[in-house]
Each structure stands twice: as structure tokens, then as C-alpha cells.
């Protein structure tokens, strides 16, 4: 998809960019694969804010996505490429030979009419899902499982991909989109190809109102708060933060401070840490 730019007819339009949605083939989602989506506004079951800067936004319906890709041996044909308001990637509606319909994350270069397959015997072709142990070294993949049968959890955002680097016993070595190199069980499934809609990261929201449509609320700087609200708060005028390093609102060091557990169980699977 290409990026569309606007002329600076107003301060909000100046610099604003949007995707042209040229790859989208329909604006009518499959009703049987929709579910209601209640707004949480960043609150947990106690009503406490656990994720800041969320709330409002346009009403959405959830699209039920097939992350497991467990429909083995039954060919499916791509019916539509659709927009999904709940993720950065586009989604593809697949009509299977037995009559079932499922949504999958749309890989780059997947077109309407193409055929896809799942299972250990599937070809190494864009959109096909198979165990990592059956995928050749050097192949780009996405929607990777961490536990067989759980469904894809890694590399699902627009424009991302991971690469199979090697095989070692029952594990496959994969370089993730973050640059981290880790071992994943060979029985875990992945989908061949890169995630589509790679232009997503180039979009400039342009104005505050558009961010509110997306459910993003304002981010207030700690230095303009009161001391009771933030470690950076207080002072007369534009005061320095008065601390050795920047802090979170809860008094923890931030901007480069490592928060990962020192003895994380998954450390043994990580060969090289991600890039900063």
C-alpha cells in the first residue's frame, strides 16, 4: 500500500499521511467471524488503570483470527483482503474446501484467489503454515508459536518477519524482528512470508483528534505535575527533575533501566539478546 500525503490546508493536515488502502478488496467483514469488543480504557477487573493513555476511540468489532493454523491438509482460497481496526496488519478471509471460513494475518504479496495450506506437508509458499522443523534455513516467517498448538504469538505486527537461521536437535534457531536470536521447538508452527502492510510505520497521525479516534489519550509530562503525582513534579517554573536519572511515576528508574527478571526461565533459549 502506498502512502497518501495531504496539502497543508490546515495545521492538522500539514504533515498528515494516510495509507491509500489499495490492497483492501472489501469493507464488509464476514459476520460469522465478528465478536463484540467492550472498551476497557486501560482498566483491569478492579477498575484500576493498568495501561495509561488509553480510552475513547471509534467503536470496534473484534475479528476472530486463526492464529493456530491447524486446518491440516485442506486447501483454502483467499477470498478478500480486509482492514482490521484491532491490529496494524491487514487480514485475509480464507474459504476452505470443506466450506469453513477463517481469517488469517495477511502476508506480504498474498493476493485474492491464491491457495494456501496448513500442515507438515505444506509447500514452502507464502501464506502456508507448517512446523518450523520443516521450514528450510533462510526462510522468512511470521506468526510463530512458542508452544505447539497454542497459536502464533511472535511476529504478528505489520511489516515484521523472522528468519530461520539453523536447526539444533529438536530446536530451530530463529532471528526475531527485534534482532533477538532464540531457540524455538521445531514442532511449533510458523507461517511462511513477511507480514504485509509494511508502510504502516510511515504513517504520520498528524493531529491530536486523529489519535483520539484511535483510542489514544494525551501523555502528560511528569515535570508539569505536582510532587504528589510524579517524582519529576514540583518546583518553581521549569525546574530540573532533581534526580540522578529519570523516573517512572512510581519511582522506578527509566530510559534504559532493565526490568527483565535476572533469572528468567526463558533465558536458556535466548542465544543473543535483542538490539536496543
UniProtKB/Swiss-Prot annotation:
GO biological process: cytoplasmic translation
A single GO cellular-component term on record: large ribosomal subunit
InterPro entries the UniProt entry points to: NA-bd_OB-fold, Rib_uL2_dom2, Ribosomal_uL2, Ribosomal_uL2_bac/org-type, Ribosomal_uL2_C, Ribosomal_uL2_CS, Ribosomal_uL2_dom3, Ribosomal_uL2_RNA-bd_dom
Gene3D superfamilies membership: 2.30.30.30, Nucleic acid-binding proteins, Ribosomal protein L2, domain 3
SMART domains to which the protein is assigned, alphabetical: Ribosomal_L2, Ribosomal_L2_C
Keyword Ribosomal protein attached: yes
Protein's job: One of the primary rRNA binding proteins. Required for association of the 30S and 50S subunits to form the 70S ribosome, for tRNA binding and peptide bond formation. It has been suggested to have peptidyltransferase activity; this is somewhat controversial. Makes several contacts with the 16S rRNA in the 70S ribosome.
Protein family: Belongs to the universal ribosomal protein uL2 family.
Oligomer status and interactors: Part of the 50S ribosomal subunit. Forms a bridge to the 30S subunit in the 70S ribosome.
Stated name of the protein: Large ribosomal subunit protein uL2
Gene this chain is encoded by: rplB
